[in-house]
Every structure is written in C-alpha cells, then in structure tokens.
Amino acid sequence: MSLRSDLINALYDENQKYDVCGIISAEGKIYPLGSDTKVLSTIFELFSRPIINKIAEKHGYIVEEPKQQNHYPDFTLYKPSEPNKKIAIDIKTTYTNKENEKIKFTLGGYTSFIRNNTKNIVYPFDQYIAHWIIGYVYTRVATRKSSLKTYNINELNEIPKPYKGVKVFLQDKWVIAGDLAGSGNTTNIGSIHAHYKDFVEGKGIFDSEDEFLDYWRNYERTSQLRNDKYNNISEYRNWIYRGRK
C-alpha cells in the first residue's frame, strides 16, 4: 500500500479512540482540558504525531517538524534520496455544536509561501510535491463545573471531556480549498463550507491544483481591490477569460 493509503487507514483505525481526559502533572494531578479550541487543536496534533511517524518510517520517509513557530507545514516528509519530492502535512481542527452541521477550516496564509517561495515555510515551496490536510472534526460538549477541579489517576472515568464524536479525514489541500478568505480580515485561505463527507470525498470547487494556486496568488487583500478583479471562483474564471483584465 502507498504512504497515503496506509496513513488514511491508520487514522481511521477504530483503535484510535481520541479519548484524552486531561493533562497530567509530575505529581499525578490531572487537569481537565476545558473547551479552549487552541488546546484541543494541540491535542489532535499530538494524536497525529505518532501515527505519521510510524507510517512514514514504514515507507522510508524522514519526518521533520518546524523549528520556528508559525512555519508551514506541521510535518514535512521526504526520502533522503528524493529531497525535492517532499510531502507537507498540516493538522487542522474544527468543531460543530451538533452533529451533521456544515464545517469549515482555515488552510494557511495566501500571502506567504505560495507567493514567496521561502516565506514562513520549512523548506522552499517548490520542493513540495503534495500538500495534505489531516482534518479533525468534533462536537463540542458543554463545560461542567466538574471541569474546574483536578483529578487523580483513579478518577479517570469522572473527568468530563469537552468533545465527542471525533471524525478525521485526509485530503489534498487544493481539493478542499474554497474561494473566500478564512475569516474576517485575515489573509488565510478558507476551505469549502460543507459536510464532513464532502471533505472525505473531495467535493471541492477548483478544477486543479494549478487553478487553486493561481486563484490564491492573485487574490487581493481588500474587498475594494477584489471588486476590481474577482471575489469568487466564477469571477476569477471570467477574469481569466478576459485575459486577466
């Protein structure tokens, strides 16, 4: 099986219960996770690390993580004999308040490495041949007062967890990318806004990775500039048809 197939199977493995109760101290105290999305995103990245390392080693890949904060990607995989065929893996997390809601992710900046080959990226962008997203989706559970206390190892079953119903997928970034910025005035690429199965099946809006890259390399930062150029995929294709005018 391929690296990708093995990784997908490992992520879907029913033995991966994604059942973290909290953070344990050297004294044996367990601190419940709480509902902070940044904390939970870190937890799911920790889930992914040993899976990625195990499958990568099986296929002869080296795994590197960024030495600088906010550098892309979370994991770089490559074979020493093929340094210009690197694979980027980024871990993304989102939540729903009830099951089967539509979901959306932010997929990284559009003004950094896709425009400047070496900006905020572990290796030059043109050394990567694939960009994969491992996406985690969970349903939020209302925080209870019991999450404010600490526990010991004998009280594991009493510790409230702020999430349930974890789902995971692996997909190419360009396949699940949308045509709108991630949120507000940020310069992040937004994903499609769709159901979980649409991410699994890759029901995106771009015809190719080249179209995705060209769209986001030319996407303007402000709405005023976009109004003179394009705001969405339909307007982009018209812009192309007009000779980029």
Swiss-Prot record:
Cofactors (names): Mg(2+)
Cofactor: how and how many bound: Binds 2 magnesium ions per subunit.
Keyword check for Hydrolase: yes
Superkingdom in the source lineage: Bacteria
UniProt GO molecular function: DNA binding; metal ion binding; type II site-specific deoxyribonuclease activity
Enzyme class: hydrolase
InterPro entries: DNA_rep_MutH/T2_RE_sf, Restrct_endonuc-II-like, Restrct_endonuc_II_EcoRV, Restrct_endonuc_II_EcoRV_Pbac
Known partners and oligomeric status: Homodimer.
Residues given in the record as Mg(2+) 2 binding sites: 45, 74
Key words, A-Z: DNA-binding, Endonuclease, Hydrolase, Magnesium, Metal-binding, Nuclease, Plasmid, Restriction system
Gene name per UniProt: ecoRVR
Nuclease recorded as keyword: yes
Catalytic reaction list: Endonucleolytic cleavage of DNA to give specific double-stranded fragments with terminal 5'-phosphates
Protein name listed in UniProt: Type II restriction enzyme EcoRV
Database matches in Pfam families: Endonuc-EcoRV (PF09233)
Active site residues according to the UniProt entry: 74, 90, 92
Consequence of substituting residue 185 to D/A/Q: Loss of activity
Catalytic activity, EC: 3.1.21.4
Consequence when changing residue 188 to A/Q/T: Decrease in activity
Known outcome of mutating residue 92 to E: Loss of activity
GO BP of this protein: DNA restriction-modification system
Binding site for Mg(2+) 1: 74, 90
Effect on the protein upon substituting residue 186 to S/N: Loss of activity
